[in-house]
Amino acid sequence: MKFKLIIFIIIIYIIKILKSEILNEFGYGLVDENLKCLSFIGDSNNQQLCNNKLINKQLIYSTINKSNQIQSLKMVEQSFKQLTFLQGKCLNLNFAQFGICDIYFPSCVETSFGISLPKRLCKSVCKQIVTDCPTLGVSLNCSDSNKFPTIGTLYNLTKYGYTENNGFYQVECSNPTNYYYNEINSTNNQFIEICPSPLVLRNQSDSKYGEDKGYTYLSPTNCVLGCPQPFFKNNKWVQMYKMSIVLSTLSFICSIYNIITFGLLSKLKSKYNLCITFFSVSTVLMSLMDIVTYGIGYEELLCPESGRYAIQSDVACGVTGAFFHIGITTGVLWWTTMSICLYSEVKRFKMISFRYIIIFNSVISLILLIIPLSGQAFMSGNGSLGCWIRKTWYANGTFWIPCGISLFIGAICIVLVIYEIFKISRNLSKDNKPLMFQIRPFLCVLLVGGSFLYLFIFYFNNERNLDKYKAAIPSYVQCLLSSDENGEDCLTDGPGFGAYFTFYFFTRLFGITSFSIYGTSKIARDIWFESAYNHPFFNPYIVKCLSLLGISKHFSSNSISGSNQKRFNRNGSNFNMKQNKSNPNDSISLSVVESTKKQDTENELESNIETKENRSTDISIENTTSSKDSNTNSF
């Protein structure tokens, strides 16, 4: 008898344990009389979400006005954005999307008591999602049986007259697995990628959206970076746009002035005049890029469509990029030529015929232009103010390496010139006038060369840090995913604004620098005065004004044309113009000093060096230091 009693107690205990275990497989839910079984509100017009991922779209647990569905759509969209950037890290993310849609839009059961109850996602489905993508385990707590029951959810409907199972109404859990595998091959049920603003979704498997078309994809997603790339906030980009067009316009005007002065009006075509003219032509071409870009619109030209930067096949980009490249390449070559000419004058060795230098610089510039053009290397890039070469090997091979070589040659010439000038100054006099005579050419060579050197250093420093910038992209994406301002407060890692601003500042300063040094010189003013005097329209007015003012003015043969000398004497209204014979091979000196009276003549010495092809000019360093050696070249 006792044995039977023990057996009975054990059976009762086991039943209680089993019942307890069974009950543990259920979750408990609250009843909300305000929620009903209604149809799915549907996806928004421009974004597919759960429309094809719900088991039963006609019975969704929802408020009467469906306001909770609107909020749920926002939550699903945010979840899909995060899943987009988990590609490559997780398996079967499409299945996770089915599960997420089921969580936010649970299926609904209508009871005979007029109460609507939701179906919760099965724990097995939750565990499968987390197993495929452990990262989601942070937001999905599969051990919570109230949210993810193993069998179903129990709802207490006692007060509604339900008496079975002690008043607990059982609703089985939702398992979309079978539905998922039935729909997996449907074209409407593929994994949905959503890119957070300002990233743009493109299909990179489509050739028209390939990277070579101007798209920068954030692998392994189909999201592309915005254009321009958010290195800085919008107001900073506006500052750079304004700086760019203002400096480029001024540089363009200054360069045109130099071309007219030293290339067209000046009667003497010396090598320094030619260097200044060709260098000014190069800065005109560089400035045209910004002027054309501004005319079209910076963002319109550089970013022709959302998420795409301009490439060479975009005509405006190809043309402006070619202008800028041949301009800056030619500028580097002519700067180097000026450095070599400066050194040749100091050392007094004869250079090759200048026509060969012109041919050499022109041919090299064209070759360095044709190579990137043939490789479709011109593009605006994600963060730039204009189109230029963006492919690394083309950029290095057709500009930066030649630029480095030119900078090296020019730097050597500068150092040697400084050494020679100091040596001459020390040997001839304690006076520093020989050095002061070279102030303008030194300024030109040093300032322009220093600008090119900064560009060189900035570029390669930027290239060196590219991996660091790329490594910071995930942080930028994470910022976008958590941003409440459409990503406007998020920035990618890149060059500092100051360094970036300075880089573009220097590339637009060359024309202004050249004008400040040469265009404002005494000789430039005299060239314009002589040209105006020789013009039949202006001549009578100039003669009359000089006569009325009683001005005596003298044009040195070395300071203007090298072939004539004009003297204006104070003789009331009488005006004399006196020809002075001089060797036609005499060259114009671009070194400027103040005029000094010597008997009847005022000799003007410009601060640029001018070579003599066959014999010395009338003014020399020895003249300055009272030496009588007439064969010494002028500095």
From Swiss-Prot:
UniProt keyword Manganese, yes or no: no
Recorded topology in the membrane: Multi-pass membrane protein
Residues modified by glycosylation: N65, N141, N156, N185, N203, N382, N396
Main location class: membrane
Compositional bias of kind Polar residues: 559-594
GO cellular component: membrane
Stretches with biased composition (Low complexity): 623-635
Organism whose genome encodes this protein: Dictyostelium discoideum (Social amoeba)
Region (Disordered) location: 559-635
GO molecular function: transmembrane signaling receptor activity
Full protein name: Frizzled and smoothened-like protein C
Residues of the signal peptide: 1-20
Keyword rRNA processing recorded: no
Transmembrane intervals: 245-265, 276-296, 315-335, 357-377, 399-419, 441-461, 497-517
InterPro entries: Frizzled/Smoothened_7TM, Frizzled_dom_sf, GPCR_2-like_7TM, GPCR_Fz/Smo-like
Segments on the Cytoplasmic side according to the record's topology features: 266-275, 336-356, 420-440, 518-635
Residues on Extracellular side: 21-244, 297-314, 378-398, 462-496
